């Protein structure tokens, strides 16, 4: 590229969590508003943006792969690397021939950074000390959409808990939250645009606390008071942050709040939980689930789960299997343990990969069986389903129930973005099939 080069196209690839997805959409929106055209990542573009993840070694490897892929697509392109891997790895710029490296700050400034690069023709490194960040950074786009039915709102960022295996406090910084009034206004806007499901997302969602000391309960309570035909789904929660106030509010307002709780477990062994620096026991986790189920019996629970934590023994695995059989979660995001630099567990003796693989297979098989078992409780029951899409050349519409079950019905009508009651008739693989109740 020479000094007169004009950029017209960009491509972006996102790795990792919903928060990253949210921020990528904000970057995308800003570039489009400034006249750039998005093209697929596997085609030639003037600018490539890779919004990275570093939660596991696999995430790092994928991030590097997409950076290299961008170079192959266009050796003269501007390569921008952002996100968590970029935040904690200072040596990426030289190793991977990056034009612009930012972390989790300055994602709102990508267009300005591109112009700065074009003007100076010098590589730009803007990675700040994320642990010093105290204010929630507003994005250029307030929310993102999925399937034209669901919208995500990022309510907070960062985490104050130093779990021994986790790199997130170093890549995302300390906890900081968006003002409650701002969130409420965004929800009103989304509802006026006919969105039926709002997903509250963040790094540590239940740790929400804005500068006016509004808590997560305060936020939910005020959302519950809003007018409109919509429901709210809450993303990842820590078990020790779920109090009776939150449980009572969510379970007693089933039309407003989805009866689906994603509560982070991470291990079914108390010894492992202690070494992970998790702030609960398996018994406390079980009692929390029972408290919720007593008030809302059809509730589904999902979780994140780490297999093969350093020092995890065969006995720990057995205890975990027994506990998972006891609580029968609806679904789990299962990760083999991955050593992260600067975390406490990186100094522990790791277990071998073959043992990890065997244990992952065992937990994955159990997860499949428990999901099937959970689905049985819905047969003959009525669920409220938000329909999203229809398979091409078929009459089967699919959507998600309040409890986060995939539900399919046959209909010749257009059901997109309609919230309808469905009587469940049978299980089909990992989904439910039913009929619409008039």
Swiss-Prot record:
Keywords of the record: 4Fe-4S, Cytoplasm, Iron, Iron-sulfur, Metal-binding, S-adenosyl-L-methionine, Transferase, tRNA processing
Domain Radical SAM core: where?
145-382
Q: What are the TM regions of this chain, as residue ranges? A: none
InterPro entries, alphabetized: Elp3/MiaA/NifB-like_rSAM, Methylthiotransferase, Methylthiotransferase_CS, Methylthiotransferase_N, Methylthiotransferase_N_sf, MiaB-like_bact, rSAM, rSAM_horseshoe
Summarize where [4Fe-4S] cluster 1 binds, as residue positions. 17, 53, 84
Give GO MF terms, alphabetically.
4 iron, 4 sulfur cluster binding; metal ion binding; N6-threonylcarbomyladenosine methylthiotransferase activity; tRNA (N(6)-L-threonylcarbamoyladenosine(37)-C(2))-methylthiotransferase
Q: Which cofactor does it need?
A: [4Fe-4S] cluster
- What region holds the MTTase N-terminal domain? 8-119
Enumerate the PROSITE patterns for this protein.
MTTASE_N (PS51449), MTTASE_RADICAL (PS01278), RADICAL_SAM (PS51918), TRAM (PS50926)
Write out the function statement from the record.
Catalyzes the methylthiolation of N6-threonylcarbamoyladenosine (t(6)A), leading to the formation of 2-methylthio-N6-threonylcarbamoyladenosine (ms(2)t(6)A) at position 37 in tRNAs that read codons beginning with adenine.
Q: What is the protein's given name? A: Threonylcarbamoyladenosine tRNA methylthiotransferase MtaB
Which species does the entry assign this protein to? Answer: Malacoplasma iowae (Mycoplasma iowae)
């Amino acid at each position: 590229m020479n000094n007169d080069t004009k950029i017209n196209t960009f491509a972006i690839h996102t790795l990792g969590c919903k928060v990253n997805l949210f921020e990528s959409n904000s970057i995308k929106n800003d570039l489009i508003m400034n006249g750039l055209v998005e093209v697929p990542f596997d085609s030639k573009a003037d600018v490539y943006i890779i919004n990275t993840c570093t939660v596991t070694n696999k995430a790092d490897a994928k991030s590097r792969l997409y950076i290299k892929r961008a170079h192959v697509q266009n050796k003269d392109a501007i390569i921008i690397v952002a996100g968590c891997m970029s935040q904690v790895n200072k040596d990426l710029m030289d190793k991977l021939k990056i034009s612009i490296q930012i972390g989790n700050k300055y994602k709102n400034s990508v267009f300005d950074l591109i112009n700065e690069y074009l003007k100076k023709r010098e590589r730009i490194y803007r990675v700040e000390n994320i642990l010093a960040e105290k204010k929630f950074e507003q994005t250029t786009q307030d929310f993102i959409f999925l399937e034209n039915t669901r919208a995500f709102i990022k309510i907070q960022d960062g985490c104050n808990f130093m779990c021994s295996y986790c790199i997130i406090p170093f890549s995302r910084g300390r906890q900081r939250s968006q003002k409650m009034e701002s969130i409420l206004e965004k929800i009103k806007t989304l509802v006026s645009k006919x969105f039926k499901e709002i997903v509250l997302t963040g790094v540590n969602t239940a740790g929400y606390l804005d500068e006016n000391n509004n808590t997560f309960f305060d936020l939910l309570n005020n959302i519950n008071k809003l007018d409109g035909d919509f429901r709210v789904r809450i993303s990842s929660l820590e078990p020790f942050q779920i109090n009776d106030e939150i449980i009572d509010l969510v379970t007693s307002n089933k039309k407003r709040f989805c009866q689906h709780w994603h509560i982070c477990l991470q291990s079914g062994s108390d010894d492992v939980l202690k070494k992970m620096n998790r702030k609960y026991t398996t018994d406390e986790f079980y009692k929390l689930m029972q408290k919720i189920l007593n008030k809302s019996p059809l509730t589904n629970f999902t979780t994140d789960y780490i297999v093969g934590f350093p020092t995890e023994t065969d006995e720990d695995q057995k205890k975990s299997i027994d506990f998972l059989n006891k609580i029968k979660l609806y679904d789990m995001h299962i990760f083999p343990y991955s050593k992260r630099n600067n975390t406490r567990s990186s100094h522990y003796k790791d277990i071998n990969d073959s043992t990890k693989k065997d244990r992952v297979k065992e937990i994955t098989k159990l997860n499949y069986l428990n999901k099937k078992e959970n689905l049985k409780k819905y047969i003959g029951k009525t669920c409220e389903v938000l329909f999203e899409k229809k398979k091409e050349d078929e009459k089967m519409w699919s959507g998600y129930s309040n409890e986060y079950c995939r539900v399919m019905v046959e209909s010749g009508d257009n059901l997109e973005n309609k919230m309808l009651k469905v009587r469940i008739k049978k299980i089909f693989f990992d989904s439910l099939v039913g009929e619409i109740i008039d």
